[in-house]
């Protein structure tokens, strides 16, 4: 096998969820059927890696120093929603009427993987909370072991700065049927049930 082909296969393997076989299929496809698409992909990738950075306020991806959401004076700066990734922020923007601002962790606490508070920019988050503008921190981390540990840490950080922490509700999906919901979700939903208003 050509060393250039091997390099291409290894390059595809940096993507999450892409193993040896998938990387090999992608490399063969680009070289056999999609050379022009491969050139566009290479140019777009090089351009993005060179020009896309992180917002100095929220850590989202942006081409400027401050992202469009943080620069928008119409957003409610008293509400700060903390999410694990830009994809989570996008999901909240599309599915809700949330008009506050965000802080993107770009991950979650995972000591075994060497990801601690510093890697998540929590020093910057603490500075933002200390400034006194934020009154509520909406913790929107995933319902995984690491996500829950991160949420606990964030709630403590919020309280240290006299900011009210809140957590996204978890439980039964809209339109879900009890018999098809996994045991963990059902147990959590049952344990955190609320009064019907």
Curated annotation (Swiss-Prot):
Keywords: DNA damage, DNA recombination, DNA repair, Metal-binding, Zinc, Zinc-finger. GO terms for molecular function: DNA binding; zinc ion binding. Residues 78-173 form the Toprim domain. InterPro entries: DNA_Rcmb_RecR, Rcmb_RecR, Rcmb_RecR_Znf, TOPRIM_dom, TOPRIM_RecR. It comes from the Bacteria. One of its GO terms (biological process) is double-strand break repair. PROSITE patterns: RECR, TOPRIM. Pfam families: RecR_C, RecR_HhH, RecR_ZnF, Toprim_4. The keyword DNA damage applies. The keyword Zinc-finger applies. A zinc finger (C4-type) spans 55-70. May play a role in DNA repair. It seems to be involved in an RecBC-independent recombinational process of DNA repair. It may act with RecF and RecO. Belongs to the RecR family. NCBIfam families: recR. This is Recombination protein RecR. It comes from Xanthomonas campestris pv. campestris (strain ATCC 33913 / DSM 3586 / NCPPB 528 / LMG 568 / P 25). The gene is recR.
């Amino acid at each position: 096998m050509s060393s250039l082909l091997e390099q291409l296969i290894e390059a595809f393997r940096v993507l999450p969820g892409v193993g040896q076989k998938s990387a090999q299929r992608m490399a063969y496809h680009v070289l056999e059927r999609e050379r022009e698409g491969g050139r566009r992909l290479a140019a777009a990738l090089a351009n993005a890696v060179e020009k896309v950075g992180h917002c100095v306020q929220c850590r989202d991806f942006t081409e400027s120093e401050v992202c469009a959401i943080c620069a928008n004076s119409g957003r409610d700066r008293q509400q700060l929603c903390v999410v694990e990734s830009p994809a989570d922020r996008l999901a909240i923007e599309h599915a809700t009427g949330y008009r506050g601002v965000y802080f993107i962790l770009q991950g979650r606490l995972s000591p075994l993987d060497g990801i601690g508070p510093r890697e998540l920019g929590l020093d910057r988050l603490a500075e933002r909370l200390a400034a006194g503008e934020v009154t509520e921190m909406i913790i929107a981390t995933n319902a995984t072991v690491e996500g829950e540990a991160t949420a606990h840490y964030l709630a403590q950080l919020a309280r240290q700065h006299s900011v009210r922490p809140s957590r996204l509700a978890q439980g039964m999906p809209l339109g879900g049927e009890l018999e098809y919901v996994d045991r963990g979700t059902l147990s959590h939903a049952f344990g955190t049930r609320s009064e019907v208003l």
